[in-house]
Curated annotation (Swiss-Prot):
HAMAP family: Rel_fac_1. This is Peptide chain release factor 1. GO terms for molecular function: translation release factor activity, codon specific. Signal peptide: none annotated. SUPFAM superfamilies: Release factor. Methylated by PrmC. Methylation increases the termination efficiency of RF1. Belongs to the prokaryotic/mitochondrial release factor family. One of its GO terms (cellular component) is cytoplasm.
């Protein structure tokens, strides 16, 4: 571990020199990439330097205890030695976590996609409930939410809704929401009071920048059509809706939320870029995931990750066996208790894998 930490510190010093190099300063892309790399290892280097400083103090205190001291001085040195040992152990744990490979997408914005699945109108209503839950969570964290496209049912639900979430650490927290969400409740239309089970799927995609995924015009087919509202009726007579097809992957994105064809195409390109980026990234991870299945699941959108039981006011996350009797609060956007537990489980799993590799 310490060889790796020393290598990280050496790289940090090298980056400091590079960032003051006129050739680097005059190259915006390289400057940004190197600055991002340095920012990503700063906490590790600072903690490692603190660790080395504590180690030096421990050695000095050891030497002091080997000398002839009066009782009071010896007692003080012993207390200081014990405190330093505890501080060293704490720093070692922090360093282990800092060495866990960071998801390069963690600091990205999020494209959120929610779709009603099994359960008809009730599934669409639940999709709407999930979107409101995530919107309130985003508000609590100071993130901005912008609806990019929606297919409402007319009864307060959505067959599909796509939104952008902009804010610090958005992907690092929202990525654990990928998967199938199941609801158990009595629908308002149910006269017999029977509990129904419905499902909605959630996809969390990191926003991909143009420099990260290049989409060539020749690979994209663009179709335009008239926008339609709930029930299929036309909402305007102009051909403002846009459908983009990425020919190499077959990925299709339709957008009709805006009255402007140009705005719809711009939004569709953002979603298309994110979906293509996500597809390539998932394929690149397949071999790694085959060797180490994450403790918090595969991220597969068909994987059932959570159940929301309304009669019992209960939420269960099946990946980590966590049950919380606070469904009313969860649906108001108070998700941190669940997400923090998922992050801890994920970090613990990665740390165990790192220790096994060493």
């Amino acid at each position: 571990m310490y060889d790796r930490l020393q290598a990280v510190e050496d790289r940090y010093d090298e980056l400091n020199e590079l960032l003051s190099d006129p050739d680097v300063v005059s190259d915006p892309k390289r400057l940004r990439d190197l600055s991002k790399e340095q920012s990503g290892i700063t906490a590790t280097v600072e903690t490692y330097r603190e660790y080395k400083n504590v180690n030096e103090q421990i050695n000095e205190t050891k030497e002091l205890l080997g000398e002839k001291l009066d009782d009071e001085m010896r007692e003080m040195a012993k207390e200081e030695f014990a405190e330093l040992q505890k501080e060293k152990a704490d720093l070692e744990e922090r360093l282990k976590l800092l060495l866990v490979p960071k998801d390069p997408n963690d600091d990205k914005n999020v494209i959120l996609e929610i779709r009603g699945a099994a359960g008809g109108d009730e599934a669409a209503l639940f999709a709407g409930d999930l979107f409101r839950m995530y919107s309130k969570y985003a508000e609590s964290r100071g993130w901005k939410v912008e609806i990019m496209d929606a297919n409402p049912t007319g009864i307060g639900g959505y067959k599909e809704i796509i939104a952008m979430m902009n804010g610090n650490d958005a992907f690092s927290r929202m990525k654990y929401e990928n998967g199938a969400h199941r609801v158990q409740r009595v629908p308002e239309t149910e006269s017999g009071g029977r509990i129904h089970t419905s499902t909605a799927t959630v996809a969390i995609l990191p926003e991909a920048e143009e420099v990260e995924i290049e989409l060539h015009d020749k690979d994209i087919r663009t179709d335009t059509f008239a926008s339609t509202g709930a029930g299929g009726q036309s909402v305007n007579t102009t051909m403002s809706a846009v459908r983009l097809t990425h020919i190499p992957t077959g990925i299709v994105v339709s957008m009709q939320d805006e009255r402007s064809q140009l705005k719809n195409k711009d939004k569709a390109m953002k979603v298309l870029r994110a979906r293509v980026y996500d597809k390539f990234e998932r394929e690149a991870r397949e071999e790694y995931d085959a060797n180490r299945k994450s403790a918090v699941g595969t991220g597969d959108r068909s994987e059932r990750i959570r159940t929301y039981n309304y009669p019992q006011n209960r939420v269960t996350d099946h990946r980590i066996g966590l049950t919380i009797q606070k469904l009313d609060q969860i649906m108001e956007g108070k998700l941190d208790e669940i997400i923090d537990a998922l992050i801890l489980e994920d970090q613990t799993s990665k740390l165990e894998h790192l220790n096994d590799a060493n």
